Amino acid sequence: MTDSSFLSDLPLAGELISTNFDSWPEWLKTEFTEHSHDGEVGSRLLSENDRVRVWEIRLAPGERWHAHRHVLDYFWTAINAGRSRQHTFDGTVREVSYDAGETRHFHFGPGEYLLHDIENIGDTELIFSTVEHLDSANAPLPLTTGRK
């Protein structure tokens, strides 16, 4: 794909499960290709103005949010405790445990991005609030649905 060495500086969470694409099914590889420029970083766009986009991600146990691309500086906050599995465009797979209120911040330089999915592997609903800063080094990706 592309150079992902900058990812080592991002606050990626969780336990590293896999480091290459060998464990990925073909449908998942296809999804990452088809969604490689998908800026829908949440399941519902709650608010947008000239400074920020505020998203919600709400996943039932076993549910996943498809591959999507982050290009804007952003942060997420876990609304409740839970667990997820994430596949990342560099082939890594991580399993992550979250505490309620846990927050992580991400910064992207020009041309940098994070392409990943998220699946709820816990026993309870997993809810996040994600805030993207529109005044970042990269232009915002266009939104196709926004699910507002």
Describe each model-derived feature in a short phrase.
Residues 70-91:
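Glycine- and acidic-residue-biased ligand/ion/polar-headgroup-sensing regions
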Residues 66-71, 116, 120:
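His-enriched metal-coordination microenvironments in redox/metal-binding proteins
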Residues 2-55, 88, 93-115, 119, ...:
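A short, N-terminal "cap"/entry segment at the start of jelly-roll beta-barrel domains
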Residues 59-62, 101:
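Tight coil/turn sites that cap or link beta-strands
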Residues 39, 47-52, 60, 69-71, ...:
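Short, surface-exposed loop/turn motifs at beta-strand boundaries within globular domains
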Residues 61, 71, 80, 110-112, ...:
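Short loop/turn positions at the edges of beta-strands in beta-sheet-rich folds
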Residues 64, 83, 103-105:
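Residue-level marker of beta-strand positions
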